[in-house]
């Protein structure tokens, strides 16, 4: 057992902090400390407040984050908090443009050209393409929306990303270097046609505009709803947690 004054912190990236707190005798001492992976490299730490979290508990955790060299940002308790809630909108656009005619490689090239540290499809390979696929299986939702049909197809072929040596990209043994795979492009087109899409040319400018504005719009909603303390905090989340280019203003 922990002492009564102990802070109870969870590293969850999505679970409801208030629901976790409701299962304890001390909801005022419960909050989220969402470290970003890989934690020894990524500087962001989301400190997620629940409805009952005491101010001194939040202050203590923000101070701890600063002491260990993190960019600690206070976030409200909503699905995905600040960073992952915005990421969902960005990811949706990155997948929609592929259904419409772009390839995963073209999407990554466009966004890395804009200044992102890593394109979304390279990110999916690093995180693991199978994470969403397995959660869909557990939830019993079948194939899900067309935007994830390509992921499903890759996973059915055991192409789970970097860890399996093949995902949206190919990887040589012992290497993390992503190699463009034309087979992925062909599968993306097949999936889009199956979903009823007719391919068109999608420019790099359109890819960047749609993906980045999805981030901007969701960030504005989060600020308006009070889940972020300031626009600067949202900038810090994306610069230090997701590799948004500082020269673009955060």
Regions found by a protein language model. Give the residues of each.
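N-terminal glycine-rich phosphate-binding loop for ADP-containing cofactors
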Residues: 1-250
């Amino acid at each position: 057992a922990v002492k009564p004054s102990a802070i109870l912190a969870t590293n969850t990236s999505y679970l409801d902090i208030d629901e976790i707190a409701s299962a304890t005798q001390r909801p005022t001492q419960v909050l989220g400390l969402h470290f970003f992976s890989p934690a020894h490299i990524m500087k962001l730490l989301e400190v997620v407040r629940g409805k009952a979290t005491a101010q001194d508990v939040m202050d203590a955790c923000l101070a701890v984050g600063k002491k260990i060299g993190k960019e600690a940002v206070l976030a409200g308790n909503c699905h995905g908090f600040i960073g992952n809630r915005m990421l969902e909108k960005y990811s949706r656009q990155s997948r929609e443009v592929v259904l419409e005619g772009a390839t995963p490689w073209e999407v990554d090239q466009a966004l890395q050209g804009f200044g992102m540290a890593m394109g979304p499809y390279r990110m999916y390979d690093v995180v693991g393409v199978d994470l969403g696929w397995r959660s869909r299986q557990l939830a019993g939702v079948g194939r899900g929306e067309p935007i994830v049909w390509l992921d499903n197809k890759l996973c059915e072929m055991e192409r789970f990303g970097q860890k399996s040596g093949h995902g949206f990209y190919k990887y040589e043994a012992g290497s993390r270097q992503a190699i463009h795979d034309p087979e992925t492009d062909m599968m993306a087109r097949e999936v889009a046609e199956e979903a009823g899409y007719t391919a068109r040319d999608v420019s790099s400018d359109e890819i960047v505009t749609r993906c980045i504005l999805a981030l901007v719009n969701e960030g504005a909603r989060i600020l308006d709803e009070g889940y972020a303390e300031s626009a600067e905090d949202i900038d810090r989340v994306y610069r230090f947690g997701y590799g948004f280019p500082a020269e673009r203003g955060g």
